[in-house]
Amino acid sequence: MAPQLLSFANATKYSLLPSSENLLMTKSFKRNKTKSHYPFQYKPLSPKNPTTLITCSSVSNLSTPKVEKAIEEEDLQFEEEELEFEEEEKPLNEIWKEIQGSDNWEGLLDPMNSHLRREIIRYGEFAQACYDSFDFDPHSKYCGTCKYHGAHFFEKLHMANHGYQISRYLYATSDINLPNFFQKSRLSSVWSTHANWMGYIAVATDEEEVKRLGRRDIVVAWRGTVTYLEWIYDLKDILCSAKFTDDPSIKIELGFYDLYTKKEDSCTYCSFSAREQVLAEIKRLLEYYDGEEISITFTGHSLGAALAIISAYDVAELGLNLTNDVDSTRNETEIPITVYSFAGPRVGNLKFKERCDELGVKVLRVINVHDKVPTVPGILANEKLQFQKYLEDATNFPWSYAHVGVELALDHKHSPFLKDTKDFGCAHNLEALLHLVDGYHGKDKRFVLAMKRDIALVNKCCDFLKSEYGVPPHWRQDENKGMVRNSDGKWVLPERPRLEAHRPEDTAHHLKKILKRATTTNGSPQLGAI
């Protein structure tokens, strides 16, 4: 008998009511597995307990007549200029490996391939979901966790039409030296004194979506920072050896390394490091879907982009993307590993970049040229320095960093919808970046919204749209900021179902398998802190 697909938390005690907004998702899931295979099980609503009516989402219906008129005029002008953009004759399921970077996106960025544009935005929305579901409110005892139970995660964010199901939530200990990144409650009674929710792992379960994609996709989405850039000042700009390999010359930034590898034995959520959580869950899913065409895609924004690259490298370095055991009679096949990085900083040194290339980790970095985050760390020595390799090899220069992968550089000044601002947070904003992807068709080509993505999304967490469009800044929030009336008629923040940590015995079981494989393959374990 096959193992259960997802062995996460028990059923939610309190359920959240569906939003009153018009949902974008209309496709019903056609699952060929029972509900017991999914991580979060459903239970009926509890009439005795307060519930929350959520009216916020990762999508928007705030478009004003002025916005719609501007887009219509843009479309007319676009048609009059008779600009021609390449339309792919082949469906995505026939060219998905190229779209995932098998040829380093050669010929797909200029002009922008329409399949690639949609995939960049789709994975960007997976990263944005980490923000839209995160509780930033310091007045809530749930500050630092996810607002939604995994069984309802994509539904609450109006993303059920993406065809994915949450497999596992990811946590990291906040007891490291990045105080401006972690969110903590001001209350004495809190959900956890050590942990912060860091993202999730999801898998394509809708068979129609799997058919469209051409494979079973596993996505790892990391939370970063929406517009706040204070965390940059916490970086020590210190490189440390990545203990995922025997080569000490491969180095990554110390703060990123600590965030990925540190754990807190006394904490239910962080008794396993974020690294261990990711590796164990990917191992489990690959075993469950053994024999299928699979891809592993990492995505993240800002600091989350750094974690996406590190975890993708880690999976490849350990050979988890090699589908069969070493003693198997079948030949091993390599599962593609792709990273969609949004506004990410540099992660490691030139040796780290070169090793990612050797392992076949494909990274597409999407940036705004006015954003400062992609310029750090490594201001003194980086990939733009002609003699960087000599500097690292001959002098062991301790502050040398290099970006990994292919860069898609966009400019927010090319969008007619965005105002000129000196707010660095706007240039760093993920929704603004996805807006730029939607309008980009190639170098020196006019900005035209190809997917007609709602421009109101840009102002979800910032003030970047021109005021003439009538979209308020920072508009996204829960109705009444999550407050509800209890049975006594008083306004309170409702209790949420407890998010149980993933079963430790399950995580330990799959980590043991990884360790055995690493030892068998190389004669010595490569798991470092594990």
Predicted feature residues:
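Serine hydrolase/lipase
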Residues: 2-119, 216, 252-253, 257-259, ...
